[in-house]
Amino acid sequence: MILYEYPFNERIRTLLRLEDLFERFAFFLAQEDPREHHVALTTLFEIAEVTGRADLKSDLMKELERQRQTLAPFRGNPGIEQNALEAVLGEIEQTLANLAQMQGKTGQHLVDNEWLASIRSRAVIPGGTCKFDLPSYYAWQQWPAEQRRQDIAKWILPMLPLRDAVTIVLRLARESGQASKVMAMQGSYQQMLSGRTYQLMQVRVPPELRVIPEASANKYMLWVRFTVQDGDVRPRAVDIDVPFHLTLCNL
């Protein structure tokens, strides 16, 4: 099944973007080629842009604290797997402690590093990081891969508590949902929400159908419409019945 996720609010939208950026960063950092480490570095700059929001850290801390207070009363409950509960609570408490130790504006260390700031300003220009533009950066790219990797890992280090917090919040949100099998009649599906508030919708479709879900929602109803794309033609609505799995997640 192919998984599509749709955030219902700006906070979850930001967390999903950060998750995607951190995953891309980790992938390219693990590679060996200087061009792949260039992508890791520019992704680091993107992470800094998104995490630079003044309220992101406080929002994550409030959500983790809320989850901690929700889960803590289940300690000693015979109906709850205690080892799993303690693992989650320990992870939350450690991440809260790490977030509390973060000082100043997120990503400020990248701004204060004049060399990185010069690369960052050139990276937004198409082809702006050529060797004749940034010879010192080109020289750094000739260093051994492990040395470059250590440098980039050092630069991401102050942001890792945010990554851990994002991972926990999204995992708890996803685990809160229960998948149901539904059918989009003639490619269209709608469902009343009965006033319940959700943060995230997951749509899983069989890959062999080659359909693309488009979703929207308000506090009363959600809609899923399936489209198909042929070659370079823009997606068009399908008129066949589409079976899929729908999950609504609520922290």
UniProtKB/Swiss-Prot annotation:
Instruction: Give the InterPro entries listed for this entry.
Output: ZapD (IPR009777), ZapD_C (IPR027462), ZapD_sf (IPR036268)
Alphabetical GO CC annotations of the entry are: cell division site; cytoplasm
Q: Out of the domains of life, which is the source? A: Bacteria
Q: Which Pfam families is this protein grouped with?
A: ZapD (PF07072)
Q: Which compartment or compartments is the protein found in? A: Cytoplasm
UniProt keywords (A-Z) are: Cell cycle, Cell division, Cytoplasm, Septation
Gene3D superfamilies the UniProt entry points to? YacF-like (1.10.3900.10), YacF-like domains (2.60.440.10)
Report the record's Gene Ontology biological process terms.
division septum assembly; FtsZ-dependent cytokinesis
Q: What is its main location?
A: cytoplasm
NCBIfam families listed in its UniProt record = PRK05287.1-4
Q: Which PANTHER family match?
A: CELL DIVISION PROTEIN ZAPD
Q: What does this protein do?
A: Cell division factor that enhances FtsZ-ring assembly. Directly interacts with FtsZ and promotes bundling of FtsZ protofilaments, with a reduction in FtsZ GTPase activity.
Q: Which family does it belong to?
A: Belongs to the ZapD family.
Q: Cross-referenced HAMAP family, in alphabetical order?
A: ZapD (MF_01092)
Subunit field text = Interacts with FtsZ.
Q: What is this protein called?
A: Cell division protein ZapD
